[in-house]
């Protein structure tokens, strides 16, 4: 299930962004996608008794993507952060599907 959600995250630009121009474009030009994927890992560890590891992953992701998502936040499926720089999502936030 976890990897299926990651695959969905990687496919969102193609589905939702008219400026999408290929997978390499996602790799280099979509920090929101990478912030979300990093969050999925951080959230997993944060909610499985490894809060410290979730916080470390979240901190590194914040530095690399300029997107600050607390590892305790809940983010649904099929979410796409276009132009994500500067997004801040707190620990108690719940972002639904789609």
Where on the chain are the PLM-derived regions?
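Terminal amphipathic alpha-helical/low-complexity segments used for targeting or macromolecular assembly
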Residues: 1-61
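Alpha-helix boundary/capping detector
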Residues: 32, 36, 40, 67-71, ...
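Beta-solenoid/beta-rich acyl/carboxylate-transfer cores
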Residues: 68-80, 84-98
């Amino acid at each position: 299930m976890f990897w299926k959600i990651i695959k969905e995250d990687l496919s969102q630009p193609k589905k939702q962004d008219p400026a999408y121009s290929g997978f390499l474009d996602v790799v280099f030009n979509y920090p929101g996608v990478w912030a979300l994927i990093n969050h999925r890992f951080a959230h997993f560890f944060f909610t499985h008794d490894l809060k410290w590891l979730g916080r470390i992953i979240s901190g590194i992701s914040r530095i690399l993507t300029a997107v600050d998502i607390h590892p305790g936040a809940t983010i649904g499926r099929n979410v796409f952060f276009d132009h994500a720089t500067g997004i801040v999502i707190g620990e108690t936030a719940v972002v639904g599907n789609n």
